[in-house]
């Protein structure tokens, strides 16, 4: 699952995240964030819940708003993408500089994340200090041919992303 974390702790806290769900697992709300990090506005309440908070699998930048993800099971893209996850980052509104506005890729091995998120589809944000953006990715799905569709509610478009045999340089 993807999680958009709380606001009000600064530009870089707490991280949004992507993680698997454990039955009966506690992920911190509202007493802790990203593992056993106490929410300072709760003044140490419920330390027993803070201690049992599960640390998520993958940190994403704070306030980037991960809205959707899709696991890649196709064969159109290079083999390195198979089994990994594409995650849409809708973008920020409450940071001193904009961030997000892209699709990232998280590699997987043996059903678990095996690396950090890396940029896959970018270009919606003109510059971090500029308040103007070209679009905001929302959803991502894989089509039967292995290409991806990415919805964009800022640009009011649906983008088809396919692989043509060469890597971008």
Describe each model-derived feature in a short phrase.
Residues 1-135, 161-169:
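Beta-propeller domain segments
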Residues 141-169:
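Blade-level signature of beta-propeller repeat domains, shared across WD40, Kelch, NHL, RCC1
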